[in-house]
Amino acid sequence: MKMAIVTGAARGIGLATARFFVDQGYQVAMVDRDEDALDAAAASLAGGTAFVCDVSDPAAVDEMVAAVLAVSGRIDCLVNNAGVADFCSIEDTSFARWRTVMATNLDGVYLCSRAVLAALKQSRGSIVNIASISGLRASTLRVAYGTSKAGVIHLTQQFAAEMGEFGIRVNCVAPGPVRTKLAIAVHSQAIIDAYHDAIPLNRYGSEAEIAEAIVFLGSEKASYITGQTLAVDGGFGSTGVGLPALRD
């Protein structure tokens, strides 16, 4: 049975992605640093196994990958979904705050991807990184977050360029506004209205819609796609419209 690793799998897009992989007949290694939430998520999903790990810790990542291989003997897909959201002005973004964002959002993607390469060479598998539309276009209050996600997009291309000769595909999904619990909690009505006005489809995406794109890129259905970033954003990136509501 094929094995997919999904980081940040305790909730949201990561959990939705794990469910879709299970539906496709995969075993899923569900990775997160929030042990309680991860255990609850894994208990709700037949075919999912919890692996507690902080992806910004190199030793912890190596241990996690070794543990997954001990269980499954193979890795066919890695989804680098773990991330932290941080919205702060440039002047108020300390270097410590900057590094906290980079450690998970960019370093974690590099560490996990590098750790699975030997296994993916054997399976001729794939990596799907989760960036953001904030990595494709600049916006206010996202100096660390947006830069980290832009780094993920370029890292995707670097890995694709170098790993293609081994049959490893590496792609990226850049979600637009998604109706997650976090978004519902932190987005004011003014922000929601502004997004709706700027999105041609006039709504937020769902976790399931993002997960569908991730699983597609990770599967053999995308066998001739590598080094690409797929914006799943309802057309938001095509409008070129700024959102004044996000300045507050």
What residue ranges belong to the model's regions?
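Active-site helix of classical SDR
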Residues: 113, 148, 156
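Residue(s) in the substrate-gating loop at a strand-loop-helix junction
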Residues: 132
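C-terminal helical subdomain
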Residues: 172, 193-225, 232-234
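The beta1-alpha1 cofactor-binding region of Rossmann-like NAD(H)/NADP(H)-dependent oxidoreductases
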Residues: 35-36, 53-63, 95, 208
